[in-house]
Each structure stands twice: as C-alpha cells, then as structure tokens.
Amino acid sequence: MKFAVIGNPISHSLSPVMHRANFNSLGLDDTYEALNIPIEDFHLIKEIISKKELDGFNITIPHKERIIPYLDYVDEQAINAGAVNTVLIKDGKWIGYNTDGIGYVKGLHSVYPDLENAYILILGAGGASKGIAYELAKFLKLKLTVANRTMARFESWNLNINQISLADAENYLAEFDIVINTTPAGMAGNNESIINLKHLSPNTLMSDIIYIPYKTPILEEAERKGNHIYNGLDMFVYQGAESFKIWTNKDADINSMKTAVLQQLKGE
C-alpha cells in the first residue's frame, strides 16, 4: 500500500520516518513519502494523488481545512474539529478523519491515568484545541475550561465548556490539574508568551502539543517551577498510529514509531 503526507513546507516532517519504522517493524512493504504541495497548486490535489496511486494520506499545515471540499465524506470528529489530518481512499471515495484529538488524549492518559477526574484548562481555541476538547469531553467528569485571547473564536463551538479569557485563566491557574497549550506560541521561531505561570500550582501537569522544540518556553518555565511537564511527541505518534489503523485496520507498533522519532530528534 502507498501512503504520504502533504503540506507546505513539508521537508521538516518526521511522518515518513515514523511510518516507515512502523512498516519495517510489522514486516510490511508499504511506502510513505512527503509531498510538498503549495497553496497555489492545491486545486490539483485530486490529480496529484491519483498519479501517485495512494491508498491514503496525512495532511498537515496549511491544508487541514483546505482539503475538506475535496472529500466525499468527513467523519464526526473531523467535523467537530473543523480540520482533517487523515484521508482514506476507498473504492474511489475520499474519506476524511481527524486523529489529532484522540492521539493527544491517548498519550495523555498514559501519563495521567486518573484523567477522567482531572480539572483541565486548554489554552487556545483553534482546530487543534477543538479536536482535543471534543475527545476529552467524552469522558471528563468535570466541565472542561478553554481560554482564548478573543471570545469570538468560540462562536463556532457547540460544546458545553467553560469559556474564559487568557487573562482570567492566569488568575485561576491554581485550580487546574492539567494545563494544555494548543497555540503556536513556543513553536520553533515563535517565542511569544501565551500566559503568565505565576499562579500555577506545583501539582499541575503542564502540557504542550508542540514537540519541536522538545521543551517549549512554557514547558521550560513550568519545569523550573518544579512542575511535571508533557510535550506533544506522544500526540504525534498516537495520531500516526490512529491513521495507520484507519488505512489498514491493523494496530501500529507504537514503540518503533516513538523510537524512530526520538532518534531523529536527537540527530542519530
């Protein structure tokens, strides 16, 4: 079977390394490549994918929303998130999924077993935040809180959550068991500070969905304060495993995928 990841730029993507490691571990001769498709060429997506004879593909920045009009069907999670990161091509039909939310939550559950009883704050209200929020809301016993700079961003949400400003979030930080940053602040080349951690409780798990850099400024600050931290590496690995399951109906080798990504990040 043939797979790929599409984006622009795409040369930095670790998806090929991760998926190939999984294929090798499972003894599969499947292939996975990175395809750079600029925005101005995206209208040719059907033609490009058809020529490659792909069975499925991942989509990353900046095409996660742009792909939707080209799909024959979009699953509920992707509709809720307003973004697609996985496409299955079956019987000529393109089916869109979003595995980011379930990928993050599966990873988080592995480091925070009592997740159901946690009081959680999500920073940011974009597509990534939405996907994670919908997944968490399925089983959390306490109402989820989401903070954003502008309240207008919540107009497209139809989830029963506490909506607060980032300024209010700073004041109430001590109340939360887990704080999750879903904004681009801290991504390589972006040193913007999203929130002041002055009131962060020492017992709070500070998380970020970014994994490059391995420790974002907000994670470094929380770690200096003595907090446990959790980056986005597991989310990346688990969302990839979920994509593989959608494409092949097989379980991925999580350990081989994570090891391959870690080796790449360490420059091995």
Swiss-Prot record:
TM stretches of this protein: none
One of the protein's GO biological processes: chorismate biosynthetic process
CDD domains per the UniProt record, alphabetical: NAD_bind_Shikimate_DH
MF (Gene Ontology): NADP binding; shikimate 3-dehydrogenase (NADP+) activity
Catalytic class of the enzyme: oxidoreductase
Signal peptide: none
Annotated pathway: Metabolic intermediate biosynthesis; chorismate biosynthesis; chorismate from D-erythrose 4-phosphate and phosphoenolpyruvate: step 4/7
SUPFAM superfamilies assigned to the protein according to its UniProt record, in alphabetical order: Aminoacid dehydrogenase-like, N-terminal domain, NAD(P)-binding Rossmann-fold domains
Binding-site residues for NADP(+), renumbered to this chain: E76, G124, A125, G126, G127, A128, N148, R149, T150, M151, A152, R153, I209, G232
Gene Ontology terms: cellular component: cytosol
Pfam families in alphabetical order: SDH_C, Shikimate_DH, Shikimate_dh_N
Residue positions of the active site: K64
The EC number(s) this enzyme carries: 1.1.1.25
Catalysed reactions listed for this entry: shikimate + NADP(+) = 3-dehydroshikimate + NADPH + H(+)
UniProt keyword annotations, A-Z: Amino-acid biosynthesis, Aromatic amino acid biosynthesis, NADP, Oxidoreductase
Residues that, per the record, bind shikimate: S13, L14, S15, T60, N85, D100, Y211
Origin superkingdom: Bacteria
HAMAP family: Shikimate_DH_AroE
Function: Involved in the biosynthesis of the chorismate, which leads to the biosynthesis of aromatic amino acids. Catalyzes the reversible NADPH linked reduction of 3-dehydroshikimate (DHSA) to yield shikimate (SA).
Similarity comment: Belongs to the shikimate dehydrogenase family.
Assembly and binders: Homodimer.
NCBIfam families xref list: aroE (TIGR00507)
Protein's name according to its UniProt entry: Shikimate dehydrogenase (NADP(+))
Organism: Staphylococcus aureus (strain bovine RF122 / ET3-1)
